[in-house]
Curated annotation (Swiss-Prot):
Residues 475-479 are annotated as: G2. The lineage of its organism: Bacteria, Pseudomonadati, Pseudomonadota, Gammaproteobacteria, Cellvibrionales. GTP binds at residues 450-457, 496-500, 550-553. CDD domains: IF2_eIF5B, IF2_mtIF2_II, mtIF2_IVc. Signal peptide: none annotated. Residues 586-588 are annotated as: G5. Residues 450-457 are annotated as: G1. This is Translation initiation factor IF-2. One of the essential components for the initiation of protein synthesis. Protects formylmethionyl-tRNA from spontaneous hydrolysis and promotes its binding to the 30S ribosomal subunits. Also involved in the hydrolysis of GTP during the formation of the 70S ribosomal complex. PROSITE patterns: G_TR_2, IF2. Residues 496-499 are annotated as: G3.
Length: 940
């Protein structure tokens, strides 16, 4: 072998240069610098010193013999005649030590340099063996280690040419067949001298663990050596001194070629294979601690008594030996089965030591069975507690929030009150608030209302015809009831609500979807009943009015008549000092159209309209329908944010993903900014007109809120059965505010209408008053019922009746309709309803007077007055007053009323009694006045 420097030697063995120089100095070598050369003799000297320093003998025996004895148990027979037979197997093997080559010496030196501490630990573990054995036994231990190492190599992914684990029938054959390859193959010399040995199997397992650890260390050294050789090979190609570096690489001697045929050099392993080997070694170590013998499954089970950890059980099962297909592991009769693991006979559940307190969420109404489930108790227990509280219910009945709270607290749990709109609140918390969003100016939303015969449709068609750009697809046909118009004053969004059904529903839900209302009135026809309804709707919504006096091109047009009639409805023109703009227009000639749009733009500019854009879209549903081939089609108006295709939309009880959006011209669009009406596809069911829509984060949340709204709507429908009735009009009214009785009045002639309105307005006083939210001449229509439902009013008909649609709607919504034919009867019933809304008057009535004749002392009540009833009767549990010299000095309650030591409830006039006054001392001569408080209904 060529001479190398100290630095190259340190690099080849994977150790530091300082450590190599220190060990050379201890060995007596004269190397001082990393550039000093090291010959083969100096290497052998260093290797011998390292071996002697770690207690290794220089000379080892050439031939050793190993004896092994294995005892197993075999069960024969079946049923009651089963017998147990002990089988003892004895084995004897002879091994010949191989000669140590130069390459093996270098590897051994590398092992000595890298891991002396680990070898010291191994020496310590082996030193625990008793020393009362001979040197021949130590030789047997070394050979046992060699056998175990051979078995480990046989189990590796790259086995050696011969496998010694194959059993043979005769011991002599085993020795003869294994002696020859042992002589031909060089084996690494043992590092640690074994001083003693055990023949017991447990000691063999310990020795196997030590040899296994040694094998892992050798594999690590081989890997490092291979990495070093790869690094040197890469450096050869780049460095300029290729010849010098090539000479520094150690090559095997020529005499080793023959031996290398039989002994292959270990192949460098990847990081994954090293990780698998480390994991397998850890499993084997843990299994070695728990298992005393690996002869059979029964002995594995005896060593694993009551393993509690599941991971330990899995490790033992994986590490326990499995029988091979060829029957190589036949130490027991059932060697092919899994090892029997004994586990501690305990279940994982532990009985709670204390009472568990739950936080029970209680909504506004909850079923008894569901409440019991939330407290983790039986429903019968909840029914018992409710019975103690005086409530008799079944497990399927619902109880209110207060009762459920009392039951939960009485049963020792914590009640958490949940609002009925908790789901809605959580949804709104996930959406960015409008106050925190960026606001931008938006176009005003204009609603055109009026009588159908007054030219409303013609006015809308003229505006669209003149404002829609030429060449637009669908510019003639209006696909939806809303569209946008570009004017010189900006964009305007027009909304058409025929029949006012959508507008009424919007106002009922508090959705302010419109900014300005254009009231169309025909100049030749004047104010009609539907015109009055439009005024009432606009006032209820709180939006400004712009009156368009249409048909001024006709000869019979009279704009002043329209102003006079609307002034009677409190719609005062600006010319007369009011705040309502009147514009004369003609839908046929186009006269006044520009002034009308300018007036609307001016009114919108005063409102300073704005909307957020960087928030989830929200708005209101204009109308919806089922279209054949397209499914649910909904017309919506975006009020805030930007609606995009693909958003998850929630509208009332409907939800779905926006699959397509169509504008008023029939074009498909991808997004819609605020104040833009669009048609959308993708909802599961048609939403109600006036429902507010909102874009939610995910479909699961939309489904949850939709189901909650459906359940809430069913509950509210049941609660509305008592609404809008004269007998219940005073319910929910505040005591300090003026109470209003809303009425929708319909009569047969206008004279009767004016007379009844004047008479009912005079009935009220400072506490109660009649308010006419709607009225007119003619029969009761569906619009009247809708108006009454949204305002909580009572419908009164004088010599008129409701049509079929209005009657069906009133029956379904439990709205009350009253018919009268005599005006005095109508006024008397309304007066009675107003009187019922008045607060009752409290009147005191003196029921008896008792005079104190003497005062006694009672240990239970304190002072007791001996009295004589001089007027009326004295009653127990009624309020009293104590009068001294005809002056009231105390007001309280009677604590006791007795006659001859007996408790009585009443003492008549002229009889004596004992009266105990609570928290007051009376004197002789005082008068005790007993009174009663009664509530008397007031009248107008």
């Amino acid at each position: 072998m060529a001479e190398v420097t100290v630095s190259e030697l340190a690099k080849s063995v994977g150790a530091s240069v300082d450590r190599i120089l220190a060990q050379m100095k201890q060995a007596g070598l004269s190397h001082q610098t990393p550039d000093d050369t090291v010959s083969d003799e100096e290497k052998q000297t260093l290797l011998s010193f390292l071996k002697s320093s770690h207690g290794e003998s220089a000379a080892a025996p050439k031939k050793i013999t190993l004896k092994r004895k294995t005892t197993t148990t075999l069960k024969t027979g079946s049923g009651s005649g089963r017998k147990t037979v002990n089988v003892e197997v004895r084995k004897k093997r002879t091994y010949v030590k191989r000669e140590l080559t130069a390459e093996d010496a270098t590897e051994t030196a590398a092992d000595e340099v890298l891991i002396p501490e680990q070898e010291q630990l191994e020496s310590t573990s082996v030193a625990e063996i008793p020393e009362s054995v001979s040197s021949d036994t130590a030789v047997e231990e070394i050979v046992a280690d060699t056998v175990v190492e051979a078995e480990v190599e046989a189990a590796s992914p790259e086995p050696e040419p011969e496998v010694e684990a194959t059993p043979e029938p005769e011991v002599e054959d085993v020795v003869a067949e294994e002696a020859e390859p042992a002589a031909a193959e060089p084996a690494p010399a043992p590092v640690v001298e074994q001083r003693s040995s055990f023949v017991d199997d447990a000691e063999i397992l310990r020795q196997r663990a030590a040899v296994r650890k040694k094998a892992e260390e050798e594999a690590e050294v081989a890997r490092r050596k291979a990495d070093a050789e790869k690094a040197e090979a890469a450096a050869k190609q780049k460095a300029e001194q290729a010849a010098v570096q090539k000479g520094s690489v150690e090559k095997p001697a020529a005499g080793d070629k023959d031996e290398s045929k039989h002994h292959k050099k270990p192949k460098p392993k990847s990081e994954t294979e090293e990780f698998d080997e480390e994991a397998k070694a850890k499993h084997n170590k843990k299994a070695g601690k728990a298992v005393k013998k690996v002869a059979g499954p029964k002995k594995v089970a005896s060593a694993l008594d009551y393993v509690e950890d599941k991971e330990e059980i899995d490790e033992v099962i994986h590490s326990a030996p499995k029988s091979k297909k060829g029957g190589q592991n036949n130490n027991s009769s059932n060697s092919g089965s899994r090892p029997l693991i004994k586990v501690a006979n305990r279940h994982g559940f532990k009985k709670p030591t204390g009472k568990i307190t739950y936080k029970v969420e209680i909504p506004e109404e909850i079923v008894v069975s569901e409440l019991a489930q939330r407290m983790n108790v039986k429903a019968g227990e909840v029914v018992k507690h409710l019975f103690k509280l005086g409530t008799m219910v079944t497990i399927n009945q619902a109880i209110d929030q207060e009762t459920a709270q009392l039951v939960v607290e009485e049963m020792g749990h914590e009640a958490v009150l949940v609002s009925g709109d908790a789901v809605e609140q959580k949804l709104r918390e996930q959406v960015v608030e409008v106050d925190d969003a960026e606001l931008v100016a938006r176009a005003p939303v204009v609603t055109v209302m009026g009588h159908v015969d007054h030219g409303k449709t013609s006015l809308l068609d003229y505006i669209r015809k003149t404002r829609v750009a030429s060449g637009e697809a669908g510019g003639i046909t209006q696909h939806i009831g809303a569209y946008r118009v570009n004017t010189s004053h900006g964009e305007l969004a027009f909304l058409d609500t025929p029949g006012h059904a959508a507008f009424t529903a919007m106002r009922a839900r508090g959705a302010q979807c419109t900014d300005v209302v254009i009231l169309v009135v025909a100049a030749d026809d004047g104010v009609m009943p539907q015109t009055e309804e439009a005024v009432q709707h606009a006032r209820a919504a709180g939006v400004p009015l712009v009156v368009a006096v249409n048909k001024i091109d006709k000869e019979a047009a009279d704009p002043d008549r329209v102003k006079n009639e609307l002034s009677a409805k409190d719609v005062i023109p600006e010319d007369w000092g009011g705040d309502t703009q009147f514009i004369n227009v003609s839908a046929q000639t186009g006269e006044g159209i520009e002034e009308l749009l300018e007036a609307v733009a001016l009114q919108a500019e005063l409102l300073e309209l704005s909307a957020p854009v960087n928030v989830p879209a929200r708005g209101v549903v204009i109308e919806s329908r089922m279209d054949k081939g397209r499914g649910v089609v909904a017309t919506v108006l975006v009020q805030g944010g930007e609606l995009k295709r693909g958003d998850i939309m929630l509208a009332g009880q409907s939800f779905g993903r926006v699959r397509a959006m169509v504008n008023e011209y029939g074009d498909n669009i991808d997004s819609a900014p605020p104040s833009t009406p669009v048609e959308i596809l993708g909802l599961d069911t048609p939403p109600e007109a006036g429902d507010e829509f909102l874009v939610v984060p995910d479909e699961r949340k939309a489904r949850e809120v939709s189901e909650f709204r459906a359940e809430k709507e069913r509950t509210e429908r049941m609660q509305r059965q008592q609404a809008a009735k004269l007998e219940n009009m005073f319910a929910g009214m505040g005591s300090d505010e003026k109470k209003i009785l809303p009425i929708v009045l319909k009569t047969d002639v206008r004279g009767s209408l004016e007379a009844i309105q004047a008479a009912l307005l005079d009935v009220g006083n400072d506490e109660v008053q009649v308010n006419f939210v709607g009225g007119g001449v003619g029969g009761i229509t569906e619009n009247d019922v809708n108006l009454a439902l949204t305002s909580g009013a009572v419908i009164v008909g004088f010599n008129v009746r409701a049509d079929n649609s209005a009657r069906k709607l009133a029956e379904s919504e439990s709205a009350e309709i009253r018919y009268y034919s005599i005006i005095y009867q109508l006024i008397d019933e309304v007066k009675s309803a107003l009187a019922g809304m008045l607060d009752p008057e409290r009147v005191e009535e003196i029921v008896g007077i008792a005079e104190v004749r003497d005062v006694f002392r009672s240990p239970k009540f304190g002072q007791v007055a001996g009295c004589m009833v001089v007027e009326g009767n004295v009653y127990r549990n009624k309020p009293i007053r104590v009068l001294r010299d005809n002056v009231v000095i105390f007001e309280g309650e009677l604590e006791s009323l007795r006659r001859f030591k007996d408790d009585v409830n009443e003492v008549r006039n002229g009889m004596e009694c004992g009266i105990g006054v609570k928290n007051y001392d009376v004197k002789v001569g005082d008068q005790i006045e007993v009174f009663d408080v009664k509530e008397v209904a007031r009248e107008l």
